[in-house]
Amino acid sequence: MREVNFNIPNVNKASVNITTTLYDRRALDCTSTLPLINSLNHLAYLTTSSARIRDILTVDGGIERLVCILKEGRSRDLMEMWKWSLAFQCVVNIGVRGSESVRTRVVEADMVPVIATILDNYIKVVDKARARADSESQRQSSRHHSKAVPTSNDVSGRPSFLEQPLTAEQRTSRRHAPPSIEIPPQPFFQENHVADSNVLDVTSPSRVPMTSPPERSAFGQDVHHRRTNDGRFAHGNHRHRMQPLATALPSMDATDGFGLRPVRDNERLPSMLPGFHTGLTSQPDSPTTPNAPVQPRSSAQATIARQRPSLRQQQSASGESDDGNGDGSTMDEDPASTEAAEPIVGLQNRMDIDDVGDRDTILGGVSDSHDLTVTDPSEEQEAETFNITHRSTVDGSMINTDNAQNNAALGLSPTQAADNANSPALVPSPYSLYFRDRTTTAAHGVLTTMPRDEDVLMSLQLLAYVSKYCNLRSYFQHSHFVPKLKIDRELQMLEEGTSPIEFPEDEDEYLLPDDVNIFPLVEKFTVRHHSKDMQYWACVVMRNLCRKDESRGGIRQCAYYKCGKWEEFQRQFAKCRRCRRTKYCSKDCQKAAWVYHRHWCHTTP
């Protein structure tokens, strides 16, 4: 029987591998991990820069082989995890940068079940982390409240903190905002803040809001003294017994209100302190002058930096427009969403200014439990540096061909050429930080097997590019989960005080029914507590669901996933009055779908 590990003895090669100048399909069949990682590392570069390589992979079985590597599951071994990540990067490059035929082949190679499993795992981990964090915070708040409760006479005779009369100075300070801070208009997602807070309240009553990074959360010294000298903040013990006021304040952009300056060491928040995040390096203010003062930008420059380039502007390497033929699929086409002060990607548009004065208390509470108030990773880097394919892997748009050739002659990987000072530091998810601080074996097991934020982000982006083809919609609405990629066992180990459940052996994947609709999974990422990038790409996918099928006479499908009814003729279904894009066959479907549709329903004039 033929050995799958091909070798070339005459050139002293133990295995065939892929280089930056040579593609050999036999290298993907290698069963040894190290040479396969080497080949996948170079293939990631080739799939980014060469349209011909992407086309070849669709006809020689290369995509199927990459999907098989992904379906083998994530292992706790570092080399196996590296192999899985590189294979996933290659498939995303092929699907995002390829032509319509190439993207069709990616979907036909059964990539959708892999994406569905990744999204489902991430949702389960987020729900588990939030549930455990809420229960822990409630226990801590109840224990703290029991220790700090005064006598009954004092309670009956003294008004509460919220009932105390305000002095004239305090009333004035409450009525008027500080002169150095300007509050911009509320974003579009805060229209239903009161209605949403009952279901999707991210900040629990006992958590302390924290802001990052240092270059975009610098507070003026006058603001600091004004808040610390205010009588409302003199009672530090009341802060832990009430919900932070930051949840009731409208979000604001730091760059629009006041000029930024370097942060002194004695003014740093916990998230700014060196060594607070182990193994992470913060992004400098400037790639060339890390300690240079940050200059205030004009409103026009800030607006440009906050705007995300639409899919219409992101051309694939093969020269095809990524937006298809009309019926736009991006959020940029919504004039109301662009005119409202809601940046999709870019500078930090939210600053929790409450409880900043008492920094010692904040530092003292860091070690107890991690705050799961989500800080958006996309807000910690400039819009021009945002790239969905993270810079630690190869990005052909940033690589100089001369340098790549020189590195190849020296035996270096192109990854080293792309990894420079402009590469932003990847900020871990607050949920991964939550599990990382837990010393139990089960928590570390979940941490090693849970999808990374980059994996979820690339999955959503890949779906955004392939879901706009209506002839492929059946692949998204009738899919399944990959058994070897599921993390139900690891999540079950986190349950304390429960007997372990004996899970049945995983069935073969080909025996599983295709009863999973991926659109409800994607719709859950449009909720606010996910990062802005996840919300953006999830909204693009959901808007692609509203496209009309030109091959069937321009009819549309009911947007409620449990219905899925198609129009019998054009304009049979009524559109949503707010977004004028989503169609429903009945009022009942519209009411049932509004629970999540409100998060990606944007007003159009």
Curated annotation (Swiss-Prot):
Subcellular compartments: Cytoplasm
Q: Name one GO cellular component term.
A: cytoplasm
| GO MF annotation terms | zinc ion binding
Tell me the Gene Ontology biological-process terms attached to this UniProt entry: establishment or maintenance of cell polarity; positive regulation of flocculation; sporulation resulting in formation of a cellular spore; ubiquitin-dependent protein catabolic process
Where do the segments described as Disordered lie?
A: 134-187, 203-352
What broad class describes the main subcellular location of this protein? cytoplasm
Q: Which Gene3D superfamilies match?
A: 6.10.140.2220
> What residue stretch is flagged as signal peptide?
none
Q: Positions of the zinc fingers (MYND-type)?
A: 560-601
Q: Where is the composition biased (Polar residues)?
A: 279-315
Positions contributing to Zn(2+) binding: C576, C579, H597, C601
* Residue stretches of biased makeup (Acidic residues): 320-336
Q: According to the lineage, what is the superkingdom?
A: Eukaryota
Q: Which InterPro entries match?
A: ARM-type_fold, MYND-type_zinc_finger, Znf_MYND
Function as written in the Swiss-Prot or TrEMBL entry? Involved in determination of the onset of polarized growth and morphogenesis. Plays a role in the regulation of branching in hyphae and spore formation.
| Similarity field | Belongs to the MUB1/samB family.
Q: What's the name of the protein?
A: MYND-type zinc finger protein samB
The organism encoding this protein is Aspergillus fumigatus (strain ATCC MYA-4609 / CBS 101355 / FGSC A1100 / Af293)
Organism classification, top ranks? Eukaryota, Fungi, Dikarya, Ascomycota, Pezizomycotina
Gene name of the record: samB
